[in-house]
Amino acid sequence: SHLPLDENIAETCRIIEMARPYGAAVEAEIGCVGGSEDGSEEIAMHCTDPADAVRFEQETGVDALAIAIGNAHGNYKATPKLRFDILAQVAEDTRTPLVLHGGTGISPEDFRRCAQTGIQKINIATATFDSVEQTVRGAYDAGAIGGYYDLQGAEVQGAYKNAHRHILIFGTDGKA
């Protein structure tokens, strides 16, 4: 989150209050994951302070907590250097399931290490968008897009390819 900690806690509590009557889970972000989801701006990253993560968890009761450990939304301009020391400390100090935003471009080895160290959910949206675009372009260039359903099929195939690739990387195939 780009909000100061106190504001982030207050906003998250407000959202949780709205979500709970509907049985909806709430995921919140603490620390500042760099980049931006649509790649339109470069936002500086600030790693999550483990003490702040403990306070955030205690004061909000959030269902899942996305932390900043050197990860960034969108495509990386350089190879990310993840702070596994911070991840390990947050995982040790909290009980809330941990989330990694900005998974696109992280190496398979680092994905596995994240999972082994406490991350339970990894977001890979940008990789999915890129795979969909690449698949649609390939189908279009091959003359295989004759209408809406062809386009939709190519989009689904692109998303499937990326999801399948990451399922294999994460080692979660056959573990539904």
Name each model feature, range by range.
Residues 6, 44, 101-102, 157:
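Residue-level marker of alpha-helix boundaries and capping positions
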Residues 1-94, 108-124, 130, 134-138, ...:
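Alpha/beta enzyme core
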